[in-house]
Regions:
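Non-catalytic C-terminal interaction segments of nucleic acid-processing enzymes
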Residues: 140-224
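Trp- and S/T/G-rich repeat-edge/linker motifs of beta-rich repeat architectures
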Residues: 1-2, 50-61, 191-195
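Catalytic cores of nucleic-acid endonucleases
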Residues: 96-166
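Charged, often low-complexity linker/regulatory segments
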Residues: 1-43
Length: 224
C-alpha cells in the first residue's frame, strides 16, 4: 500500500470509507505519519519505559487472524510490528469514532450458532478469564486480544499491546467504560486514556492495553 485509499478494497463495505468515520480516519492517521507511529499512539507507548522509543517496522491494515476451527477470523484494523527499548512487540489497533464494541458475550452466544461454545472456551482459556464472569464483557475485545497474542506467538515476539485508537471527542470517549471493564477483568485496568496498563503474561507473551485519544484528520495538526 502506498496511499490511504489503498485500504478501501479490504474494508467490509466500501461505505465504511467516509470522512469522519474510523476506517477513513485510521488509514489517514497512519499514512500521514509517514513511516512513523501516529503521534497519539507513540505518546501512549512512551508511558511505559519498557516500550520507550517505539518505532514502526511494518503494519498491515485489516489483518485477519485465524482464532480456531469454529468460525471466522478476527480482523484487526491495524496490526503492526514495532521496535522498542525491550525488543520487538506486536501492536494491535482497534479504531473507533462513536461505534460500540458490539455485543456482549451473553448477547453474542444467545444466537446459539454452532461452534460458539468451542470458540468462547478457547478465548477464555487463552486470556485467562473467569468463564463464569465473561457474560457482560464485549466479545470483540476478547477476540481482538486473542488475535494479538496469536500474532505475537507466531512471530516469536514476547510483547503484545492492544490499543484503541479513539477519534471520539474527549468528552464522549465512546466505548471507554466497556474497555475499562474488560481490562479490569484481565487484571490490568486502563483507568484513563493516554496511559498504558501494566502487563499480564498469557502463554509466554506479555499483554498490555491502552486507549490512545486521537483527533479526526480535519482537527489534527499537520505532522512536523
Amino acid at each position: 500500500m502506498v496511499a490511504a485509499e489503498d485500504v478501501i478494497p479490504f474494508l467490509g463495505r466500501p461505505s465504511h470509507w467516509t470522512i469522519g468515520r474510523s476506517a477513513y480516519e485510521t488509514a489517514h492517521s497512519w499514512f500521514d505519519a509517514a513511516g512513523r507511529l501516529p503521534a497519539a499512539l507513540a505518546a501512549l507507548l512512551a508511558t511505559d519505559p519498557a516500550l520507550a522509543g517505539a518505532a514502526l517496522e511494518r503494519a498491515t491494515f485489516e489483518k485477519q487472524t485465524r482464532l480456531d476451527d469454529f468460525g471466522r477470523p478476527s480482523q484487526t484494523d491495524v496490526l503492526a510490528e514495532i521496535s522498542t527499548a525491550s525488543g520487538p512487540a506486536i501492536l494491535a489497533v482497534e479504531a473507533k469514532v462513536d461505534e460500540t464494541f458490539g455485543p456482549t458475550v451473553d448477547e453474542w452466544r444467545a444466537e446459539g450458532s454452532a461452534g460458539k461454545a468451542g470458540r468462547l472456551a478457547g478465548l477464555v482459556a487463552r486470556l485467562g478469564l473467569d468463564p463464569h464472569a465473561v457474560g457482560p464483557l464485549r466479545y470483540q475485545l476478547l477476540h481482538r486480544s486473542a488475535a494479538a497474542l496469536i500474532e505475537a506467538g507466531a512471530a516469536g515476539i514476547g510483547d503484545a499491546i492492544l490499543v484503541v485508537q479513539s477519534f471520539s471527542p474527549p468528552g464522549l470517549r465512546a466505548g471507554f467504560a466497556d474497555f475499562r471493564t474488560f481490562t479490569e477483568a484481565m487484571g490490568v485496568p486502563v483507568r484513563e486514556p493516554g496511559v498504558l496498563s501494566g502487563a499480564v503474561e498469557r502463554g509466554g507473551t506479555r499483554l498490555r492495553f491502552g486507549w490512545a485519544q486521537d483527533a479526526i484528520r480535519s482537527e489534527r495538526a499537520a505532522p512536523a
